[in-house]
Amino acid sequence: MNALMLDLPLVLCLTSVGFYLFCIFSAVCHFSKRKESGKETEFLPPISILKSVCGADAKVYDDLASFCRQDYPLVQLLLGFQDARDPVIPVIRRLMLDFPEMDIRMVLCGRKMGINPKISNLIQVEGQAKHPFLLICDSDIRVGRDYLRRVIWPLRRREVGAVTCMCHALSKGMIGTLEALWESTEFCPHVLAASRLEGIRFGLGSTIVVKREALERIGGLSSIADYLADDYFLGNRIVQAGYRVVLSDVVVEHGLSIRSFGELVLRQIRWNRGIRVCRPWGYRGLLLTYGIPAGLLFLILSGGTLTGWIVFGATASARLAMAYVVGARFLNDRSARSFLWAVPLLDLMSFVLWAFSLVGNTVYWRGRTFKLTREGKLSPILPEGAVSIEVKEPYETASAVTR
């Protein structure tokens, strides 16, 4: 019985070490041979950038301005919001003044077109898009000047329907650092491993560039308007429609606004349950990747023997090596470089939240509680309070204002 109790955590340690090494291998293969960026090519088609925005913080201008400074010939920037008094509006107006040569439009999205407010906005924004290539990304993303040239390049191929990107987070404080560490040292390595094993069959919210014809083939954005993991399902349905989704070697930045540990926990539970619905067997298989908890359990059950310490030390070393190579070296995440020591603590917390999220189907999102269906759709649990939005000139529902 004692041998059996030791065998299970030992097997989990071995599978985890194998997984960590495979993640390192996947990262080296993905980044070491930089893909053709298209910077010297003729493939520079017109592109419309679609963003759903809400509120304004100190970084929002710089985030949006990075899309206006692109080394790219023809770009349209469409920014959708739901409230005619949204504080982001003066920021957009400043953007219009600072970049008069840029086609920037703000769109008041007064209609509710699905449970997911981001997709509801994007559906209405898309109606103003002029170009055959659409770029959808979260509002807190910041990019380099060559971003568009590089992410558009794979779409020159007929079989490619979309391109997506990983990101690293710009964090402040310990709570934000934990979230940033999770993204760069746990989530992104899993993305790289999945890409190497089966190809990318999903999208990432940091960037999804899609051919309009591919989007129309899956029924448009309205087909994912009630889903929590809208980015996942957008990419997945494009694959199901017969296209390929390519993971770019571009890594973008995004800001974090986590304010408390409780908010971090609720966010992680939402992520976990969303992943469990999207990839149920893959989510269960994550048990084989939690080397730190397994190594610690083996150390305790072995009574602190030399063998126990060797197994734990080897497992932890492999985990830290993977975190550094993927997070610090390739994703250039400052949190992974400065707080590498916190990765074991993160893994223990992540394992507890993973186990907790194996059951249950409720998620807390944007101030409301939802039931998550088996299909990944959101179903409100708490009634939504009636909100009256007064629309004033120069705004019209789902209409664009340029300058």
How should each PLM-predicted stretch be described?
Residues 1-65:
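N-proximal low-complexity "stem/linker" segments adjacent to membrane-targeting elements
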Residues 131-142:
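Short beta-strand-to-loop acidic/aromatic patch adjacent to the donor-nucleotide binding site
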Residues 227-233:
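Acidic donor-binding loop at a coil-to-helix junction in glycosyltransferase catalytic cores
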Residues 3-7, 11-18, 25-28, 286-364:
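Membrane-embedded multi-pass helical conduit in multi-pass membrane proteins
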Residues 45-48, 76, 233:
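Cell-envelope/extracellular polymer assembly enzymes that use nucleotide-activated donors
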Residues 74-84, 105-110:
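Short beta-strand/loop segment that forms part of the nucleotide-sugar
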